Structure formats: structure tokens, C-alpha cells
Amino acid sequence: MNTEYVYLGQNEYLGDALKSKYGKDCIPSSVILDKTLTGIGATFTEIHTKRNSIIIEPNVPVIVGKCQKESNCLGVYSETTVSEIKKYLNNDAIKYKKILTTPEGFKKIRKAAGNSYNQIQQTYFCLFDECEKLTQDCDYRAAITQPVYDFFEFKEKAFVSATPLNVSHPEFENQDFIRLKVEPLFDYRKNLHLIITNSYERTVREELERLKGSPCVCIFLNSITGINALVNSLNLKEESRIYCSEDGVKKLKECGFDNAVSSINYPLAKYNIFTSRFYSAVDIDLNVKPDILILTNLNQAHHTMVDPYTEAIQIQGRFRTKFEDGHTYNSLTHITNTQDLEVLSDEEVTQMIDEYTITYRELLQRYHSATDEARKKGLKQQLKRICEDYLLDERMNIDYFGIDNKYNEERVKRYYSSGESIRQAYEATEFFNVEYEERRQAVGEDDIFRIKYAPSEKVRIQRLAFALQQLDLQCSQNENINKSFFIDLLRNCYEYADLLIEMKEAVPIGFAHIASFGGASRKEIEKIVADSRNEKRRFSKEVIQDIYNVFQKHISQKIAKEECKEIVGEIYKKHNILHNQKDIKAKVSQQTIGEYFKVAPQNSEKPNKWRIEYLLPQFEELIKE
């Protein structure tokens, strides 16, 4: 897809830039309009352009907000009836019709238009706003792609966003779309404080303490469960309001929250918490300058991840009031933990998609060839299973936005594998000046959580071993760390933690392997520790003394090898040293005496004998009184 540029001056709006390039201040057709900046008036421009328009918005709140400001607009969503749309379309008093609809509401427009729908597609401009949401949301909101077929049938249409994603749908190429990129002629970068932590709740608490003097704190967290936990643990209920979907409002009311709403409600509270429904498109107009906190807690929900290239830019762009210093907010902070997530490379995603495509085409061919209704039904069910993976649309054609979603999902996951990866992503957007901070404890709350709630005991052991290894490393670099305190924290994570701690001291190489390359079962750890204890006892002062006392009289003399074996076995038994058992390393044989004394074989006579020469030097100190 070719790219053209339109240049935006300081204090200019999109309409000004378009007029400079095209001689008129309206959005051209067949473009993916990359605004670069939020709040430069793309929707405003379309609403005030002298033509009929259908503007598809991702969520209801933005539609409500725009319609409150523009009296001639019609909002179409769940509560809007077909008859209301018909009445609006037939209202001759409104010269230029401006319909703002959710993707799910679009079918009501089609139904209301009836036989006139083809005329609407020829005479109305169709604008798909915040177009990246098609890719980002189709995995859990399949209906968002419902208007796509209709969109491409409009004579004039455009995609628009400040943060559009790459698209693979072939119709963009077939219809000669171009990417129209807005290039600001001024420095527009925003300052962002990125905090990487392994103690999420503690860090959030610290930041809210820092912001206690702020007139308004706006928190963006895409998890109802996470919001519930945050408000309760930090006692924010009396000073907060939560903005989420209607379903989220119901869930929060069941948890005792009466301060949850589904649309912007002024005045805002001291603490305002928004789910992803409010990350884009919505205008938030304030008379006080807010502080913004973006929160990601991977231990709670992976969908709290925020894409630096899209969602982070959109979030800071919600605030439209410019204050005397030219800024719309005081501070922007993103707090996140990290995880070693399983991430597919683009090549692996391609291979997966290829296999889906092969299966899809084979099933589709068999479906069209089948003459038996039962076979057709079975094949259709199999096709629907692929559809459930959002790779087929409701017409059972390949869903290109679903495919784009797969790549996009893995791309964002890749950032959250380390703090440095997230930092690099933010810097690569060229939108943010990043102040990077790692706020970690030797053992953080998140480390404890991940150990306690590991999916299996083997993973729990691996995570605990890694935490112990990291604690050793940090203590070697900072002598002020209270190591025993953190050891006790880790002990409380796992009832067999002491076994692992013992292994770390006794078998450091084996322990390091478990920490770095994969866990072991508890039985394997018990065996390793038992062997270690055995080895320690075998060469303890008490055992050496007993062995020396028995064999002292045989020094410089011969003794049957089998007798040596029996004597050592009895001493091991006396000291509870496990030996000659399944899965136990310690074995007692005719050669074992050679681990304590210098011996010489005397095999010329039967039975075979040893000549005991002297106690090995390393044990001499142990037999001194």
C-alpha cells in the first residue's frame, strides 16, 4: 500500500491540513487515514463536512458524547430502534445526515433503509473510526467485523485512527486504498514514566501516595476483577468512580459497588478507573489537570497488557482540555510487571494460519461436494470450529482481521517478557520520551504470587529455585539486603521449600539447572537431597571415627574384601545411612573401604583381600581427640 503525507502545523486541526493538500477540508475516499495525533478533529471534520455520513465507532460512550455535542447526529446502538432510524432518514429538515453507530448497530441501519440501502451506499460517506479496534477486539467481540462487507461496498469510504495497525484484507489493495499519514511539523512527544516492578500492589500504592495531592487521578486498568481488588485493597471506594461496560457495572454492583457507570459522568471523582471501553475515541473534558496511571498486572489477567503503539497513545489522548502550559495532563505513568510468556514468532503464526487455511479449504471443498445433508451438517460444524477461533467470519469466509489479530496478539505479548522489551517498544513508537525505572525487591509480591499459583508443582519448584538464585545474586551485589527475611518469605510459598533450599547448598550445579532450564518433581528433589544427606553422613566425623576405630587394628594387615563390605554396611546402618536401595546413590561394595583408606588389592589368595595401608589424609583431622 502506497503512503502519502499531509502536514500539520502547530495549533492546526485535521481540516486545515487536508485543505492545504487537497483544497477542501474533507476526508478523501479510499484512504487509511493515520492521524498520528489524537484530538485533531477527524470525527469533527466528518460531522461538519457537507455530505451524508455513517461513522462507525467502536463503543457506545463516544457515540453518546458526540451526539450530546451535535444535535443533528443520530446515535445507533442497542437502545436505538429501527423506527427511530427510519424517522431520522426521512427527516428532510436535516440536510446532511450524520449517523454514528456501533458495529453491532450497523445492521439496524441496513434494515431501516430497506430498498434505499443501495442508494445510501452510493451517496453516503462511510468512516470507520478507531479502525485498529477491528484487529484488536475481534477475538472476543466477533460482531465488531460485521459491517466490513458493507463498508467495502460504499462508493466513498475511509478508515481512520491515530494508531492504525497494518491490515491484510485484500479489498484494500483491490480498491486502491492508500495510507494517508499526518506528519506534524512540531515536536509532539509526550513524557511517560515507565515503572517495571515485581511488587505490583506495593508500587501502585506508592504511586497513589505520591499523587494524593492531585485533584484528579485517572487509572486505566482492563480488568473488573483487578479493579475490584485495587479499590478494596487501597480503600478507594468512597473517592472513586469506575467506568466500564454495562456488564461490568452489573458485576461490580454484585460486589457492593454503587459507583460504577457505563458512560462519562461529570464531575469526575478523585480516583477514576477506566476499562478498555474508554481507551479510545472518548473525549474527556476537565477543568482540572489530571494525572494518568496505566496499570498492567499479568498475574491477574493478560488482557491488562497495553500496546505502546496503540492503546497507550490513545489513553493519553482522551484528555482534550489544554491548560495554560499547553498540556492536557500533569503526568503519565505506566506500572507493569513482566512474565516469561509463551510467545509465537511471526513465522510460527504464519505456519499455524497456513494449517488452518489448508483445513478450511479442504472442508469447504468437501462441503460443496457433499450431497448428503447429514454430511453437510457435520462439515459445517467443523467449519464453525475454525470460525470459533475467529479465523472465519459469520459468512464462513476467511476473516482477515482475525488473522491480523493473531499476529498482533503475539507482538504485544512479546513486549511483556522483560522490562527492556517494553521500554524499547515505547521508544520505537517515537511518540514518548520514556523515563525508565525498575522498582524491584529482592523477592517481590508478584514473585510470591507466581510461585504459589503455579500451574503445577514442577513449575512451582522451578520458579522457587529461580527466585532463590536471583536472591543470591542480588545479595552478592548489595550487602544491605536482609536475606533471611526474603528466605522466610519464600519458605511460606511452598511446604517443601526447605528441601529446595537444602539442595541449593548441597548440590549447586543441579540446583542451577532446575532454576534455569526446568523444574523437577518433589520426589526427584527428595531423592537428590537424600543422596546429599547420605554423602554428608558417610563422611561425617562420627562415621569416620567408627570406621577408623574398627579398621585401625588392620592397618598394614590383610582383611577379606567381603568382610570390609559387611563392616562398612553395619556402620552405615548404625548411622541411618541409606544404601544399596533403589534410587539411592550410596552403595556399599567391596570397594567402599577405598573411599576411607589407602588400600592395595591382595588377589593372589582366596578369598580376595585388601591390605589396609593408612587412613586417607583428608580424614586425619576428624579422628583427633
Regions found by a protein language model. Give the residues of each.
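Conserved Walker A/P-loop ATP-binding site and its immediately adjacent core
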Residues: T38, A42-T80, E104, N166-S168, ...
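Interdomain hinge/linker at the junction between the two RecA-like core domains of SF2 helicases
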Residues: T163-R210
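Conserved SF2 helicase motif VI
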Residues: N299-T328
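Conserved strand-helix element at the start of the C-terminal RecA-like helicase core
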Residues: N52-K66, L100-T102, V204-L234
